[in-house]
């Protein structure tokens, strides 16, 4: 979903990062080596199955689990994380979340935190910067503005209204000024 969304926005230059814990700094992370190994390997496996090129960065994981970050480099700054998917084996247990499996046994789920567009503010700032404010028409809140040149002409105003109705029938967001 992240990459199809990027395609919709024309984002082609990005870098995938597998953010891992630092095993030498265990105080910074949830203390469960088995969980960490399982989660990190699961993300590696998914990335490899998808054929994604990625780098691994030690010490960049969240305290509760590893994550896949998708980073971009804006025109005027350093690389930023736009999207993220985070595996969380820790918090479901802390919140005592359970589900019943097919055998009727209670199990603790794994939570996937994901932000397809990341912080909306950051995403919009990136898109505005990259497009220099020339957003794609499909993204504009008002796609067409109809402005009759003679506002005191009833026939012209009726025609302008007709144009607006035709456009709205085609799911075009239109405004009559």
Regions found by a protein language model. Give the residues of each.
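NTP/phosphate- and nucleic-acid-binding module
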Residues: 1-177
